[in-house]
Amino acid sequence: MASSGPPTLPSPASDPLSSLKRKQLNSVTRMLALNNVASKSPGSTANTSTGAEASSVDIGSYNMLPRGPPAQNQWKILIYDKTCRSIISPLLSVSDLRRRGVTLHLLLDSEREPIPDVPAVYFVEPTRSNLSIIAQDCALGLYKAAYLNFVTRLDRSLLEEFARLVVQSNSVEKVALVFDQYLDYVCLERNLFTLNKTNSYVLYNDPTTTEHMMERAMLDVANGLLSVISTIGQLPVIRCAKGGAPEMVARKLMKMISDRPMIFDRHKGRAGAASASAAAHRRPLMVIMDRNTDLITPVQHTSTYQALIDDVLTHKGNRVEFESKTEDAAGRVKTMGKRFDLDADEDPFYSRHKFNPFPEAIESNGVELQNVTKKTEEIRSKAIGGGVSERESQSGAVVFDADASASAGTNDLATAVDSLPALIERKRQLEVHTSILQAVMTQVASRDIPQFYELESALATGSYKNDQSKAKRDVMELVTDATKGKVADKIRLIIVFCLATTAPGSDIDEVVCGMRDSLGNSAAGGGPSPKIAREDEEKLSQGLAAITYLKRLRSMNMITTMSDQLSAVESSYAGAGASGDMLSTLMKSATNQATGLLAKATERVSSMLGKIHKHHVTCVVENLINQKPGTEDDEYLYLDPRISSRGGEVNLSEVRQIARAPVGEVVAFVIGPGSYSEHANLNQQIDNVIYGCCELVSPEAFLKQLASLQ
C-alpha cells in the first residue's frame, strides 16, 4: 500500500553510533589497531566473537601470505596514497592519529627513511604500482612488519603477482596481514559522502569518452557504493531509473553483492537478537540517480548557511578560506587571509544551523555568542572573587588555581569553574562562525544574491509557467543591471531560465546579448572591453560556452526541462501563509541580535528566509519512500539482492503486489557532481538520509565542467 504525507523514518538521534561516518571511523580505528578484533575503540561496535569485523575483509584465506600474530595497540607508522589520505583526513586529525599510536604518517610515493623496529600500516588503492612499492619496502626491510590494507578489493591476479615479488626478495615474513577494507569513499559528515571522482560530469558526458572508459568509470562508482553498503552492514533494496548510467551502476553493484556475500556475513552477531530482528525488519533503500535529471540545482543560488559557504567562499574538504578586511585607526584597510576547519560533528552551532536559512544562522550566532560571553564573564567574576586565579598554561589552555587559604566557596563554584573551559571553547567556535558569517554576508550583500535566489526559485517552481514573456522580462532586467551580481551570477540565472522554462532559443539568445551589452561587449563577441575585467571576461566566455552546451542538449531532448518535472510538485514553503509577518519579525530580531558587522546588511537578505522548495532528488526519494502511485515508484527498477531469481529484479508490474519491508534509512546517490544545496534540501525534508555523489562541486566549478563540453 502506498502511504501519504511526509516520509517517516527512524530518527538517527536514537543511535548516535549509527551514522555512516561513525561506522567508517570505527573501521579505520580497527585498521590502525592492526585489524585486531579484540581492540575496541570508544563507541566501537566490535564483537570479538564473530572473528571478523565491519568493513574489513581478511583475505589471508588465500594462504599465499602468512598471517601475523594478534597485535595489540602499539606505536606504528601510517603509509597511504593520495586517495586514502583524502579518506583519512575528515575522520582523524594529527592528534587523533597519535592517540591511536600513529607516530608518523607518510605518502607511499614519498622518500621514506628506514625505521626497522616499528610496524607500518599501509592504506592504499590495490594497484600494480602501489604493490610494487610495498614489495620494494619489504625487500629493503624499511619496517618491522607490513600490515596491508586495500581501500577496495585486491584482485587475485595482483595478489599473486605481489606474492611472487616478496618471495623473490625473501621478504615474505615482513608481510603480517592483507585486508580488503571496503572504504572507497570520503565521508565528510555523519551522513554525507563523495567518491572523490573529479571532473565526473565531463567524463560521463563527453562524446569522446570511449565505451571502455565509461565501463571502467561505472565500475569505479559501483565499487564505491559497495563500500558504502558494506559499512552500513545491511543489504539494501536498490531503485534506479531504467537505462543509462544508473541502471549500469545498479546492475554492477548487484553482481558485486552476489559475488561477495562475506562482506555482509561479518555483521551477524554484532547486536543482540532484538536489535538484529529490528534491523532485519527494516531495509536500507539505495536510490541511484543521474545528474542530468536535474541540472538546475548545481547552479542555482541558495539560501542555507552551509551551501552559501560553499558557493561564495573557498570551501573544500570541510576547510573554508576567505579574505577579511579591517581598518586601522589611520583609516588604512588591511586584508588578512583566514582559514578554518569546519566539523559539523564536533561543532554544535554548525550542526544545528548548516541547513538553516542564512538569516536564521546570523540571528542564532548573535544570541548564542551574547549568552556565552555573559555566562563566561559571570563565572570568571565568581571564580576570582572566590579565591581562584586564572592563568595560561604552556599549551595555551586556560587553567584556574584555587587559593588554598580561601574558603573557596563551594561545590557550585568548583563546578562552575570546571565548566569554563568548555564555555571558552564554545565561545571560540561561535566567534569563528561570526567571521564566516561576516564573509558570507559581504558577498551576499555586494552581489545582491537574494534577488537572483528569488527569481531562480520562482522559475524553478513554475511560477512563470503561464507567463513566459514576464519571465524573460524579469531575467533580462536583472542580468542587464550592471550594479547587480557578478558575471557568474548572471550566467547561472540564464541557465536556470533555459532549463526551467520552455522559452525558445531566440529568447535565451536575446537575454545573453542583453547581458553582454551591459558588460561592455558587443553581441557579436568582440574582444575585452575596458568596462569588464579580465577575470570577468574569462567567466563570461566560460559561461557562454556552458549555455551553448545546455541549449544543444535541450534542443536534442537529451535533458528534461524542470518546468515539466515540477508542474505536479507542490512547493514546500516553511512558514507559508503568514510568511510576510514571520519574515519581518525574524529579520527585525536578527538585526537587533546579530553582532555589529553582520547587522549592517541583514535587511538585504530577508528574502532568503522561508522559501524552501523541494529539489528533484528530494521529490524522487520521497515518492519512493512513500511508494506513491504514478511516480518514480512505478517506473524505477526494483532490485533486491535477497531475491535469488532474475538477478534480484522484481518486475515493475509486481512491485505493488509484493510485501515491502519498511525503509530503515535512505542512501540517495547522484552519478556525477553533487552539491551542498542538494544535501541540505534532502535533510530539510527527510530524516535519516545519507547523501552521496561522485564529487561535491561549487556552482562555478560545475559551470566550468559544462563549459568544457561545448
Predicted regions: what they are:
Residues 2-710:
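Extended, well-folded catalytic/binding cores that form a central cleft or groove in large enzyme
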